[in-house]
Amino acid sequence: MKLPWTQLAVILLLVGLTISYSNAWGADWKEFADATSGIFYYDAASIRSPSTGRVRVWIHNVTKHEASLIEFNCRGGSYRVLDLVEYDEAGRIKNRHDYSDNPNWLTISPKSVLEPLQTLVCR
């Protein structure tokens, strides 16, 4: 049986989106904090060091349906948000905010959500 081109295109599109979605959320997510603001995971496979003393990692707040790319200044005890992605309940992207040119570093407060993550990734 031959499928019309439109049906074939829709099937291929759905397969492609499924693979892309699996790659994004098929990462190595590990819980690092359970706070009043949400349950937080980090993607161990995404940890990168763009320069000496700096580490980047994706985090996911399951409660708020948000993922953020965080950069830590391991020597300075500070961080900045480089990318923020908001999802709906079905996992579709609602909004994306690119802060890659953000020059503002924030101090990591003791007992904050990011303190245990900094300890993990800045070894």
Summary of predicted features, one role per range:
Residues 1-10:
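Bacterial N-terminal signal peptides that target proteins for export
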Residues 9-19:
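Bacterial N-terminal signal peptides
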Residues 21-123:
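N-terminal secretory-pathway/extracellular module detecting exported/lumenal segments
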